[in-house]
From Swiss-Prot:
It is found in: Mitochondrion inner membrane. Its cofactor is heme b. Heme b b562 binds at H83, H182. Pfam families: Cytochrom_B_C (PF00032), Cytochrome_B (PF00033). Belongs to the cytochrome b family. InterPro entries: Cyt_b/b6_C (IPR005798), Cyt_b/b6_C_sf (IPR036150), Cyt_b/b6_N (IPR005797), Cytb/b6-like_sf (IPR027387), Cytochrome_b (IPR030689), Cytochrome_b_C_euk/bac (IPR048260), Cytochrome_b_N_euk/bac (IPR048259), Di-haem_cyt_TM (IPR016174). This is Cytochrome b. The gene is MT-CYB. One of its GO terms (molecular function) is ubiquinol-cytochrome-c reductase activity. The lineage of its organism: Eukaryota, Metazoa, Chordata, Craniata, Vertebrata. A ubiquinone binds at H201.
Length: 381
């Protein structure tokens, strides 16, 4: 078996990726989220496949088909709840995974990081088109508001929006194409994940200290396979608890009403995992400005490697940068809260301040902190 594992063309790839892979001996539980994201993706693809067998992408029957899945299909309610809450678990793991990358300086593996940012954008696009499919009130109005932002692009905006819609508003053509996108994108994500891992295995994993770990490595199996298995158990337990005990707690009550173009919900908002970006979008009282800020809030991740000024890679021994990092984390939670609030005083000003602080921290304060820490570490004569 050992020889087969090391000689068979397919087994050899698996062996070098998951069995005999040399891994740093000191990586903590923060390194579990990559494998957890893999499990989330598999769960989403499997549950999504079974949902697609019963779903109809037509404006007249989409809402009813989702109700039919929950009422009449064997374990349809469970599959639907796992799929809807699986998305929340996916994004929770994603945000923690990105946060880990920022804290420990993993972004200095530029290729891996850039593919990761593309993955994040692709997953966000997939979740957005997926949220439209049940064709409830929030599905319809969320799609209308977000796709309408394209019309803010000068000259080609209106044409582009109508091209995406397949008409003059969000309608049957939009729903059909969004279903097609939602079906194909997870497979594109799978391909990108393979590229992400390919680049990661070129350099090997980073570790909490940020120091080159080549002198002290251990095989991935059994050490990290067992450690990952523990993470899987926690993830599946949390997902099952959420799907079985409070499946609708993260959704919007408006989505229990069928889509009605003549009746606008009192407060249009996306799912919780988009609220931070939605708050940044709303904090600028100009359509094009808001769209640019929304894009910048995610694309700013691409320039983080170029803003690294510290002599040390990880924040483990950099208390000032650590403090700023946790302020950034708290700020993102604040933005998430603001995104779910109505547009009125004092939420408007809080959102504007939090949005400003978000860009200020990443673009100015954190690079300055790195330079200051370098200065503090210089031997004084």
């Amino acid at each position: 078996m050992t020889n087969l594992r090391k000689t068979h063309p397919l087994m050899k790839i698996i062996n070098h990726s998951f069995i005999d892979l040399p891994a740093p001996s000191n990586i903590s539980a923060w390194w579990n989220f990559g494998s957890l994201l893999g499990i989330c993706l598999v769960i989403q693809i499997l549950t999504g496949l079974f949902l697609a067998m019963h779903y109809t992408s037509d404006t007249l029957t989409a809402f009813s088909s989702v109700a039919h899945i929950c009422r009449d299909v064997n374990y349809g309610w469970l599959i639907r709840n796992l799929h809807a809450n699986g998305a929340s678990m996916f994004f929770m793991c994603l945000f923690l995974h990105v946060g880990r990358g920022i804290y420990y300086g993993s972004y200095l593996y530029k290729e891996t990081w850039n593919i990761g940012v593309i993955l994040l954008l692709t997953v966000m696009a997939t979740a957005f088109v997926g949220y439209v499919l049940p064709w409830g009130q929030m599905s319809f109005w969320g799609a209308t508001v977000i796709t309408n932002l394209l019309s803010a692009i000068p000259y080609i905006g209106t044409t582009l929006a109508e091209w995406i819609w397949g008409g003059f508003s969000v309608d049957k053509a939009t729903l059909t194409r969004f279903f097609a996108f939602h079906f194909i994108l997870p497979f594109i994500i799978m391909a990108l994940v393979i590229v992400h891992l390919l680049f990661l295995h070129e350099t090997g994993s980073n570790n909490p200290s940020g120091i080159n770990p080549d002198s002290d490595k251990i095989p991935f199996h059994p050490y990290y396979t067992v450690k990952d298995a523990l993470g899987f158990m926690f993830l599946l337990l949390t997902l099952l608890a959420l799907a079985l005990f409070s499946p609708d707690s993260l959704g919007d009550p408006d989505n229990f009403s069928p889509a009605n173009p003549l009746n606008t919900p009192p407060h249009i908002k996306p799912e919780w995992y988009f609220l931070f970006a939605y708050a940044i979008l709303r904090s600028i009282p100009n359509k094009l400005g808001g769209v640019l800020a929304l894009l910048a809030s995610i694309l700013i991740l691409l320039i983080i490697p170029f803003l690294h000024t510290a002599n040390q890679r990880s924040m483990m021994f950099r208390p000032i940068s650590q403090t700023l990092f946790w302020i950034l984390a708290a700020n993102l939670i604040t933005l998430t809260w603001i995104g779910g609030q109505p547009v009125e005083h004092p939420f408007i000003i809080i959102g504007q301040l939090a949005s400003m602080l978000y860009f200020l921290l990443i673009l100015i304060l954190m690079p300055l902190a790195g330079m200051f820490e370098n200065y503090m570490l210089k031997p004084k004569l």
